[in-house]
């Protein structure tokens, strides 16, 4: 009888310890679950009606990182809607997912979405409307080429922040670095010269 009581008490203490002390860690960031808010961050520009939205379904960003990122994203709402979305599961390609998400959320309105797809290990930018005249597919690919190393290093906040900084730079009519374009042009020139 004493063994049964000892076993039950040990079992109860073990279960309570796991329940009280245990906490899941997501995306190898070192943040505990409590550091994340299961809420979306959203801002609506009162002058334009465009919104900035963060939906972090893959739990890649801490609450403070979401707040700082939203501040960067607010600048883009002068030109159109802007969204950050991270996903941990995707049954389609990243391109199909982001296009479907855009149509569902914004229809044909001006805007841009940046997705970090943890299932397909991919980052993607999709723009539409007036913003697409500036941040077209070529510039979207250039931007993702410029920031993919941050995502590879699991520095998701810096990755997203750099995306929105470069998008804002382009929307202001300024230039961004395009090292892959220059390298491929140089190689093409060498091949043609030979």
Model-inferred region functions:
Residues 2-194:
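A structural boundary signal for the start of the first folded domain, especially the loop/turn
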């Amino acid at each position: 009888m004493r063994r049964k009581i000892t076993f039950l008490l040990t079992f109860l203490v073990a279960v309570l310890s796991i329940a009280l002390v245990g906490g899941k860690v997501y995306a190898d960031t070192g943040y505990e679950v409590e550091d994340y808010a299961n809420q979306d961050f959203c801002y609506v520009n009162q002058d334009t009606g465009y919104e900035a939205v963060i939906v972090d379904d893959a739990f890649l960003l801490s609450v403070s990182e979401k707040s700082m990122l939203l501040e960067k994203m607010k600048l883009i709402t002068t030109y159109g809607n802007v969204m950050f979305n991270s996903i941990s599961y995707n049954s389609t390609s990243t391109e199909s997912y982001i296009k479907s998400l855009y149509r569902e959320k914004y229809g044909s309105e001006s805007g841009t979405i940046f997705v970090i797809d943890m299932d397909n290990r991919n980052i993607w930018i999709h723009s539409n409307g007036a913003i697409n005249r500036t941040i077209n597919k070529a510039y979207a690919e250039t931007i993702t080429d410029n920031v993919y190393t941050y995502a590879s290093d699991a520095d998701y906040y810096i990755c997203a922040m750099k995306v929105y900084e470069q998008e804002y730079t382009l929307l202001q009519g300024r230039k961004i670095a395009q090292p892959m374009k220059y390298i491929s042009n140089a190689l093409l020139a060498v091949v043609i010269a030979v």
